[in-house]
Every structure is written in structure tokens, then in C-alpha cells.
Curated annotation (Swiss-Prot):
Keyword Nucleus: yes
Superkingdom assignment: Eukaryota
Induction: By light. Down-regulated by dark.
Keyword Nucleus: yes
Stretches the record annotates as Putative zinc finger 1: 65-95
Pfam families, A to Z: zf-LSD1 (PF06943)
Name by which UniProt lists this protein: Protein LSD1
InterPro entries hit by this protein: LSD1-like, Multihaem_cyt_sf, Znf_LSD1
Gene, per the UniProt record: LSD1
Its job: Negative regulator of programmed cell death and hypersensitive response (HR). Positive regulator of callus differentiation.
Location of the protein in the cell: Nucleus
Residue segments, region Putative zinc finger 2: 104-134
More details: Plants silencing LSD1 display a lesion-mimic phenotype, increased pathogen induction of PR1, enhanced resistance to virulent rice blast fungus and accelerated and intensified hypersensitive response to avirulent pathogens. Plants overexpressing LSD1 show increased content of chlorophyll b and enhanced resistance to virulent rice blast fungus. Callus overexpressing LSD1 shows accelerated differentiation and plant regeneration.
GO cellular component terms, A-Z: nucleus
Amino acid sequence: MHLSAGFLSCRERKGDFSCLTAARICEASTSDAVVQAAGTAMPVPLAPYPTPPVPFTPPNGAQSQLVCSGCRNLLMYPAGATSVCCAVCSTVTAVPAPGTEMAQLVCGGCHTLLMYIRGATSVQCSCCHTVNLAMEANQVAHVNCGNCRMLLMYQYGARSVKCAVCNFVTSVGASPGTDQKPSS
């Protein structure tokens, strides 16, 4: 295989190569190859590359989201994780304890989306350090309809929510199947 000027050429003895660069990097599946640069032959030990690990996904595929504490990107992670490493800035963000209800607000100073533990009275933005008041009256929560599984949004503090699709009344915080009935 010959490449344009400034690049190395690569000759295969046994095995198959997948790429070649000016930095004298060859990927191959065998250990017997020669790289030629400026007419000189140089043996290159080659090792098979390991297969990248498959990300762990729980059997039911459950995933949650949180905001990176470093760059404020939205991160998705599998249920059960205790911390998440951001692929953009490599910051490790702790996952809130299971059952911790989270809320969101937009920072009044820099308009960054902030996530915080529900019930907090104020939230300080990590970007601009503005202290934002968390108003209880405007907070909403989410629950899946107990009948059709539609994601429903309701005002925090409500005891139940009625689905606009199937008219099913879902009790908030109750286990599925308890005190839930279709509304007429």
C-alpha cells in the first residue's frame, strides 16, 4: 500500500491492516509486518486491539438524567449508578440517592438550567454564583399514568393526577395498583 508524499507506506507479510498514518501507526491482526519509511525497513510488533467494553445497561433499560457539575451538560446514566463521569469534561458527578426527588429551575443570572433537591429554598448557580430562590408554587413533578404509562406532569404537593388521555387517576407516591381507578 502506498500513500501520498509525506506518509509512510506499509507492506503486509501475514495478516490484514486497517489503517496507516504519518505517525507510523499500523493496526493489524498479526505480529509480522514491516513499515517502510524513506527506504528503510523496520519491524513493528503488532498486537490485536481489545474489543471495546459494551456499556452496562440494566435489563429493563432504565436510565436517569443529571446535569454535569463541571460543564452543565445533561448526562444519562443507567439506574443504580452511584456516580457519572462526563465524557466532555471528565468531571465525576455524584448521583443523588434513590428516591431523592429533583427539581429544575433556570438561573436568573446566566439562564443555565439548574437541578436541585426538591424542597430547597435557594440554589446557587455554579456558573455565575447567583443565588436563585426556589419557589414552591411553581414546582412541578412527573409520574407515569398507572393505566396507559403516559408521562404526566403535576404540581408538586398534589395527592393525585388525572391522565388527559385515558382519564385514569394516579395517586402520587403510591405503589401501582393501590387506590387508583378510572375517573368518569
